[in-house]
UniProtKB/Swiss-Prot annotation:
Cellular component, GO, one term: cytoplasm
Annotated GO MF terms: ATP binding; ATP hydrolysis activity; ATP-dependent protein folding chaperone; unfolded protein binding
Organism of this sequence: Chlorobium phaeobacteroides (strain DSM 266 / SMG 266 / 2430)
Sorted UniProt keywords: ATP-binding, Chaperone, Cytoplasm, Nucleotide-binding, Stress response
Compartments where located: Cytoplasm
Region (A): 1-332
Protein name: Chaperone protein HtpG
Lineage of producing organism: Bacteria, Pseudomonadati, Chlorobiota, Chlorobiia, Chlorobiales
Domain of life: Bacteria
Self-association and partners: Homodimer.
Database matches in PANTHER family: HEAT SHOCK PROTEIN 90 FAMILY MEMBER
Stretch list, region B: 333-546
Region (C): 547-626
Function: Molecular chaperone. Has ATPase activity.
Record carries keyword Nucleotide-binding: yes
Amino acid sequence: MTNNDTPGMREYEYKAEMKQLLELIVHSLYTHPEIFLRELISNASDALSKVRFNALTDESIINSDAGLAIRITLDPEAHTIVIEDNGTGMTEEELILNLGTVARSGTLGFLQALKEQQKELDGNLIGQFGVGFYSVFMVTDEVTVETRSSGADSAGYRWRSGAAGTFTIERIEKEQRGTKISFALKDEFKEFSEAYRIEQIIRKYSNFVDFPIFLGDNQINTISALWQRSKNEVSDEERNEFYKFLSNDFNPPLDSLHLSVEGKVCFKALLFLPEEAPPELMYRQGDLESRGPQLYVKKVLIQQECRDLLPEYLRFVAGVVDTEDLPLNVSREVVQSSKVMANIRQILTGKILSWFESMATDQPEKFRKFYKAFGPFLKIGLNTDFTHRDRIIGLMRFESTKTAEGEYVTFKEYVERMEAGQNEIYYHSGSNRIQLLAHPNLEYFQHKGIEVLLLSDPVDVFVIPSIHEYDKKPLKSIEKADIDFTRTGDDKTEPPLPETLSQPLLGLFRQTIGDVIEDVVESHRLVSSPVTLVSGKDSLDSSMEKMMKMMHAEMPAAKKILEVNTSHPIIKNLSGMIMANEHNPLIRTVIQQLYDGALLHEGNLDATTGFLQRMNELIEAATMSR
């Protein structure tokens, strides 16, 4: 410590190699310079919490009748900011201790004193890392702090530093208790002397602190921290307004979840389900990676969209999570990977799934709306959250051949109404319900009254095969060739061709179509269509194959099996044409056209020119014969 030339002013050297540490804070610790305001407001809130608590037992506190508040004054022309509170203030010793040493904070000492006295503070304090104040040096070269402690015999002091390794303290006249921080902004940060910008930052980070924040004569933080109140004390109207503020969604939420958790971790949360999936999620599901609820520590925003609070498949849930247990890195911008964070995530995930389960049971119509909007995202959890996999499967819903459009069935309901002798859960995947219901592969199941799940969500292609079975019932695509259709009989309306006629016909199909197919076999699944394509036992079904080709364009298509319905009139007519003249060129034209028609049903017909030419040939032949 050295004496300054000014009478009454003393100069001090920073402890803990402050010059290097301040450089670290300014250039490395905070990625957004606006954070300085959040930190200064948080410190002011701490000081107000302290004086409010001390006033309960200490009658000597000066200005005890003054309303507790934080006031910010701007000068856009001089580019200066003044932040003032009427909190507990500091003595000269506290100035040296709290502003002269990094990683030391009056808040931390205050909490320690309360703990030793076994008292509880009715309020929340932050700033336990002792660096928040110094973030102001990101935006200014010099800071002045004028303060007076709340004690009756206290004096006023002025602390000034340019972050160059020293600070000065001098005694001043100050009538009111509390602290006033003033500074001029660096040229590159003059925007922070504009009222709109400061209001923006307050609403973003400090909207829910316990005390009013005035910018000039206007109070900025007017919205209550609803999550801190009891669920029964919050009206639906308040929740809806809070959701609109939080999400910028003009529609009310579909539902909300109010949590207060105490145990190995303590946190409060207010979560919302949007009525519809946001457009950015509808078209870019990858945007889930950057979403998440807002994370607060004691009502101060730490992360706008905290990805660590929820698994990716639940990040469509909006809301706020607030904890006092979360350890932070030296900067509040970065949340540590910690057991506390992992525990919060685990508990939140379980609570949210319970929320969905209760909704499905007690409010099925609301759940149907939810599932229509967010079912695709929920399904992602099947392949990422193995802890809750069975619960996610229980929440899954599907349209089926026995539901109306827009209505759903669960796996449990499907199994309960399976036909006698049915041992498998059948599904059919494609682009839309109309296409699925028109597919030839569905004919047998429709004819027999066997329910088939209709999967038109692109996500289903990836997640359903991974389920393998439900209630010991294997899941099976109706495109597979290895389905046993013989156990219930064909019940064909027309008798099939005898083997002596069908085998030569199938051989001609193989010869005409060539090695682009694996085989041609007689069908037991077709009822009203002449042919269809199916996948081999170990092959991908057509929907999965198309998805894989979109991701890997060079991936070769697997050969399919062509099934031929030898009961169909077209096939019987072909057999008759062969018997009459097996060299008739029209026979091969019809065979090729039938195969291309099957490809068209699959959405895999690439060479449409040949298909149209053959169609014209067949029309010409049909019109000539009349």
